[in-house]
């Protein structure tokens, strides 16, 4: 099969299986309301949990830095792309989360891939939750290590996988808050087990940082757990983009010396780092926004009892409505759009087969009226 035939075959199969994705150009987005093709929708698909995307101080910080330092970083961090602004942000992140070092990355996907592909050598063992993000699964299976997936949020399964495995250094990986189900990992038990077996524990807290824990320090702080490696991202609660890895001095130096993702990638723009530094300040003083988000979560849970048979057990901003069938999920998503509500349909391979869903994400800017309209619309359109 030549290139064109293979590509066309795969695309046609994607369409046939109702997995085809359509990229939509958003005209205006203030986080609560988005405009697409001249239509206005209440947005329940944004990861900007605290509504900082349009924060005036953060926007001004980006403008100021772009004027002062220019737009591009001009090189990798190991050439000339690393500035005193990057250094300052890394130091502030490390101090905030009580780690010796922080390393900036251009995305969470890159950060996770860099850690796993750089650390893992032949016969090392990787133990990861079955519902781990693609940025964890893909580099793990592409590494020279041995991969084991334990039952979702099941420490007993993790332990069984470990004791029935053979190999060298164990790396345990989990998310703090899972991106598609919104549930929280049993971090305390997993952390204790990792220490017992002298392994490394890596936690991806993309959806917890800024939202959970004291001062927004994330789900690990909330559960009094300090993993050996912590990945945080700036595209969710921080309202920007990018990521950072928090770790020991030794691991940080190892990544700097051996990670191709750091060596051969252009560094984050200085203006972006400057804006993230301002966003960090806002996060540290965002208790009011976190309380408002929690109020919205509580309001949704209290008023969505009519949908309880469709909901997963989540107490976070991520509230999945499980439909199962790909086509039914897409139809419901389109029907909600006709009611002025934007909720994306999430289908395999992002989620397991037969678990297609509407992934509702609540934020601090939603009103009670927004949430009531969402619940009422889903109930009327999909009363099963």
From Swiss-Prot:
Pathway(s) annotated for this protein in UniProt: Cofactor biosynthesis; biotin biosynthesis
One BP term from GO: biotin biosynthetic process
N6-(pyridoxal phosphate)lysine PTM positions: 236
InterPro entries: Aminotrans_II_pyridoxalP_BS, Aminotransferase_I/II_large, AON_synthase_class-II, AONS_Proteobacteria, PyrdxlP-dep_Trfase, PyrdxlP-dep_Trfase_major, PyrdxlP-dep_Trfase_small
Cofactor: pyridoxal 5'-phosphate
Binding site for pyridoxal 5'-phosphate: 108-109, 179, 207, 233
Binding site for substrate: 21, 133, 350
This protein's record includes keyword Membrane: no
GO molecular function: 8-amino-7-oxononanoate synthase activity; pyridoxal phosphate binding
Enzyme Commission code(s) on record: 2.3.1.47
UniProt catalytic activity: 6-carboxyhexanoyl-[ACP] + L-alanine + H(+) = (8S)-8-amino-7-oxononanoate + holo-[ACP] + CO2
Family matches, as PANTHER family: 8-AMINO-7-OXONONANOATE SYNTHASE (PTHR13693:SF100), CLASS II AMINOTRANSFERASE/8-AMINO-7-OXONONANOATE SYNTHASE (PTHR13693)
Family: Belongs to the class-II pyridoxal-phosphate-dependent aminotransferase family. BioF subfamily.
UniProt subunit comment: Homodimer.
Chain's role: Catalyzes the decarboxylative condensation of pimeloyl-[acyl-carrier protein] and L-alanine to produce 8-amino-7-oxononanoate (AON), [acyl-carrier protein], and carbon dioxide.
Protein name according to UniProt: 8-amino-7-oxononanoate synthase
Annotated organism of origin: Buchnera aphidicola subsp. Baizongia pistaciae (strain Bp)
